[in-house]
Amino acid sequence: MRLLVQNLLVGLLSYRIWGYPTGADTTQIQGEDSRGYHARAGVLRHVNPKIGTYGASPDDNGGMIPSVSVPFGMTRWTPQTRENFISQVPYHDADDFIHGFQATHQPAIWMGELGQVVLAPGWTSDVKSLFQHRSLAFLKKDEVSTPYVYEVLLDADTEGEYDWDLTEEAAGEGPVPGGAGSVPGSVREGANGRIRKRGAVSGSYTRQIRAALSASAHTGHLRFDFEDNSYKSSAQRIQPYISIQVTRRNWTGQVEIDPRRREVFGSNPQRQDYRLGPNRPASFQGYFVSRFSEPFTSYGTSLGANISEGINGASGQLLGAYVKFHANTKRIEVRTAVSFVSIEQARKNLDIESPDGTSFEHTVEEVKSAWLEKLGRVTIEGVNSTDEEHDQRTIWYTGLFHALQYPNDFSEPTSRDPKCTRTFYSGYTDSVHESNDSYYQSWSIWDTYRAEHSLLTLFAPERVNSMMRSLLKIFDWSGRLPIWANMVETNIMIATNADAVLANAISHGFRSFDLPKTWEAVRKDAYEPPENDTELLYYDRQPDTPHEARAGLTSYMEHGWVDNDRWSESASRTLDYAFNDAACAVVARAVGAEDEAAALERRAGNYANVWDSDTQFMRARNANGSWANDTWGWTEGDKWVYTFDVLHDVAGLAALFPGGRRGLAARLDAHFDGGHNMHSNEPSHHVPYLYSLIGRPGAAAERVRALAWHDYNATSAGLSGNEDLGQMSAWYVFSALGFYPVNPAADEYVVGSPFFERVALRLPAGAATGGEAGAADGPERTLVIEARGAASGKPYVKGLTVDGRAVDRPVLRHRDIVTARVIRFEMSESPTSWGEDGEL
């Protein structure tokens, strides 16, 4: 995601002062029998959910959280160490205090939260309702984070305000209310008043709360054990309680307490991106129902710090509720279901996913099984020996874990039948719908079209068609395909890369969605400018705009580029629109529109219109054809990065350089050797693989491996940039296997350098048949990728075979991967002539 506020500090002054990122050891299970549910964890032992939870600023933070849910779950549950908002997620690994456990729908660090709820245990004489008062200290060694359960030991005697001084903005929406940004260059934000405070943390606690958390798609299951080592008499003991934060500042919510049913339920309308995009879903609410295992001895509500005991219902801002339990209570379990449909649907989600009598262990096993069904399909052998903090197996499995969280299935069940009718709320129509299909949200498409969606065709093919149908639902409702959808369109980032996501599905054999409608949707992207196209800049986070689509398409269609003196990010837009045209042509051919496909393919050559032959860089142009300043017109990059942004026509790109492929190779060398590559942002992800396409696969192997070492590790600081809904991890997952989708609208993968000596992938049913498991080639099959020596000093490819058939070019077809039994790389200690396409 792009830089929102150039100099924004989020309170972490430096990890050199405030603590180092924790390594892979933080997730290691502390003794096989410490909890019975850690048995038979299989490959999940190699997943560290804390990777990407640390960074000194929002842009060098992966933006991930140690969350628990099932693959593609609507709601993720996480420990809360911070109030989240745009540029800050609920957890940061530098923090030493937990303020509760949050049901979050914030998909990425540069996106806003919506419809969250927070539950916090307490064991103090007076109820602590505010974030800054309910701090509970913990030690990193007492955390266990896995895909299926999170556990932590909390100091129940922590008192006072710890960790953060919260300004009004931080307690509400953060530094960007409504998600709106400023006109570029006119505003620079500072630290917004947040200073991190270090609290003293002892190594042992007199009274402690042992917390454990697991979660299904819509329901969190929390368990709190209250352990008192003070030997006080029963009369002296303090009653434990659970507080629930329903709303934050500036948002009015409702809450009710039902002691008979042992329930607390309510709703809030918070949607932090409310200023972005064309949609204003007035009736949006996030609903929840919490059901407790123990009876209440007392209860009440809170508005800010004001507690009202005995009140069983309230509405207002900074709204909360609490329930107390008998002083001798040792364990409390609470199951909290979330819905975007209604309170009744939240209660139904609870009864379907975690009915009364469901043990915590059962919930954990269900979630564990869901993740093992995905990650357990892959067996890795032959891993480079290195220190624990750079363990490639941990990075790889965690990467796949990250990638299989998105997009999120926002549909909700109506019965326990897996084939039941689904119900869901659409922010586009501001109404509830029913369908026999899932409905997916959280579409960070400018990021994920590059590799994440290709990954899903291999590891989750059963969901791909439904995802494409969700895109078309959005087109039906809004008249446009999404750019960055977070419940509704936000207009974040540029271009119409949903065109490429749909083309990716088609080129990978997925066709169980409406192809004529797909062509209608992408054709509109290609030929119909957005509303007020010539009147708006469409700058980053410009509030209250219509659907951005291809801003500047008016000039792009007039003379082949987006005018820099009329639209923001013009050069990046021109290059992206050229690629989008190539993707639209794929869809056109799929429906037999050959003439329009040919026209779009010709227009896909517009990238050459922003090539400055004098400087030999891509460059923004003004309306009169003159060149703009070479620092203008870019999105998360510069002239170096975007000169290589021609995913669909690398041969044509090479032809622009004097000397052709030789000239392009020299520019690539200067790019990497000069430190211009920015792997933390997505436009750089395909760049090292260009070497392979111009006859230098040995250089590709070197660059790919260097990036994998430099930009990834197995600690909480293990991502050099934002995860962006799986794209950062998808790059690593593919690269470690030995190939990457440079042109995601096509069916090709470009060879780099495999990291492992042997990988066995049990591909899901339907991977070879476009998601149709019942087809002739639909059953599961196991693909073995062999690369002997890859982990022991042989990084270069010397030869490649697919089921014994020699492959001379460094390119694999999707069909090769999903139908083959064995892909065998012959590896070498030094560069070879394999894959060279003539002299450079």
Residue ranges of model-derived segments:
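Fungal secretory targeting signals
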Residues: M1-P21
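Accessory carbohydrate-recognition regions in carbohydrate-active enzymes
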Residues: Y20-G179, P184-H453, T457-A500, I506-L575, ...
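ATP-dependent phospho-/nucleotidyl transfer catalytic cores
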Residues: N580
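Short acidic alpha-helical/loop segments enriched in Asp/Glu that coordinate divalent cations
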Residues: R619-A620
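Carbohydrate-binding surface patches
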Residues: P744-A745, E757-E786
